[in-house]
Amino acid sequence: MSYQVSVAVVGATGYVGVELVRLLLAHPMVKIRYLCATQSTGKLLSSSYFHISQNYISISVSSFDDIDLDKLDVVFLCLPHGASSEIVKKIHNVVKVIDLSADFRIKDPDIYKQWYGVHYCPDLIKDFVYGLTEIYYEDIQKSSFIACPGCYPTSVLIPLFPLLRLRLVKSNNIIVDAKSGVSGAGRSVKQDNLFCEVYDAIKSYKVSNHRHIPEIEQELCFAACREDINLQFVPNLIPVKRGMMSNIYLELEVGVSLTDVREALLLFYRDSFFVVVDEEKAITTRSVVGTNYCYLGIFPGRLPNTIVIISVIDNLLKGAAGQAVQNFNVMMSYEEKLALSNIPYF
């Protein structure tokens, strides 16, 4: 066995954290040295998650303040915004960091403040590479600090980034109707997320005011080489555990056809293992739940010169923990799909 990378998962008891632990347990090049959380300290992870048996991992959950950074190579942060940046201040000179919060995704501290509040270490934002793996692969290879994208941005940017970069669709009339499983709201107890509140209902929330909007717009502006892109974005909570579907409505540039768009996406992602253009599989989240895949379908719109793109991912995997492991593999020069070759759940 080659040298195993020693890692800590901070925020290991949340939905994303425990998914990350599950993936890392199957990674042949990883040794999980610490599991950290503010709750369940001193307990095994199996006490909260029965599918993570103590036969797989017998490490008790500890406080972050009790870990020895000198024993670590990489720290994964699965924390709420604000909490990650406080820890990064303490560790950025010591270990590699893969952050799954929003703290280092937005490059402009003023925009971050507008949507999230005061940033605790704005001077470190520039050190982080935005971890949309298929777009920033080479930058991730060279970096020690990765800011993993949010789930909604991942599902939207994978199809839109190349289309705006290639000027195939208009940038002034982008509409996104996105739907997420309840796990996207996190594990904390909230009345709106209780079974009786979400079962048998679909709920729109934070209409045109979701915190992922500036993250998406930032990357679209970069793709299109302009600074004035705004999109209509409506997120919806659907009564399923996991899975995400984004329906994206676009107007084509003059002279561009649906075939041009489809061929452009096929060409752009020809070497990307986890992005597949497949209309049949893109119309259901069953194609991706339990995997790190993103399936894209391109369909004609009802109005002239319009198209509809459907993008499906697992919000906990390609939208969070899976993409974090994908970035880890790229950062460490491992095979990109290592520990990620799952087939979908039924």
Curated annotation (Swiss-Prot):
GO cellular component: cytoplasm
A UniProt-annotated Pfam family: Semialdhyde_dh
Record-annotated active site: C151
The keyword Cytoplasm belongs to this UniProt entry's keyword annotation: yes
Catalytic activity: N-acetyl-L-glutamate 5-semialdehyde + phosphate + NADP(+) = N-acetyl-L-glutamyl 5-phosphate + NADPH + H(+)
GO terms under biological process: L-arginine biosynthetic process
Free-text function comment from the UniProt entry: Catalyzes the NADPH-dependent reduction of N-acetyl-5-glutamyl phosphate to yield N-acetyl-L-glutamate 5-semialdehyde.
Protein name: N-acetyl-gamma-glutamyl-phosphate reductase
Source organism (scientific name): Ehrlichia canis (strain Jake)
Gene symbol of the encoding locus: argC
